[in-house]
Amino acid sequence: MTQLLIIFAAAAAGLFFFEDVRDVLKLWDIRDMRIIWYGVSIAVIVILADMAVMKWFPSHLYDDGGINKKIFSKRSIPHIIFLTLLIAFAEEMLFRGVLQTHIGLWTASLIFAALHFRYLSKWLLFIMVTAISFLLGLMYEWTGNLFVPMTAHFIIDAVFACQIRFEHVRRDKHDEHVESREKKSPESL
């Protein structure tokens, strides 16, 4: 639902900021190889940095209150892919394509971070989302192509959403195995 509101906001702001639909279409170039070089490379760097944070910092500093687990833990992989594509498209269109193009990198990045309001009370998460937003904005500045930050955004979200899903499945299988062993054990008779 939120992503549909973001798409609507991007369309409404786009009508205000852009003179013509062709101006919006100029922001996208699927043939640009920097989609791979920058988009994939930056996504891998962000994923590795996030994994390092999870390894070296206490979990209460990067815990989002379980919201992402609630969203992704029981979804199928195709549904996760669809949702993360929608999220990446909607957010990059609004924050990079419309806002950054017209009000600048810093302002768009700060608005992006602030709208991830569930992170405002967690200083580490807020720093991370602000840094990632700025990095996505820099990729757009460097390339002028929305596919580049959208690709990175999609990969980052999809990897972590799938990780949440796989952890949920693994935990369920472990719990089933433990329950099965408890039923078979002589103490339970």
From Swiss-Prot:
Transmembrane segments: 35-55, 97-117, 123-143, 144-164
Superkingdom field: Bacteria
One GO MF term attached to the UniProt entry: endopeptidase activity
GO biological process per UniProt: CAAX-box protein maturation
Keywords on record: Cell membrane, Membrane, Transmembrane, Transmembrane helix
Topology with respect to the bilayer: Multi-pass membrane protein
Localisation per UniProt entry: Cell membrane
Tagged with keyword Nucleotide-binding: no
One Pfam family hit: Rce1-like
UniProt keyword annotation of Membrane present: yes
A GO CC term attached to the entry: plasma membrane
Protein name: Uncharacterized protein YpbD
Taxonomic lineage from the root: Bacteria, Bacillati, Bacillota, Bacilli, Bacillales
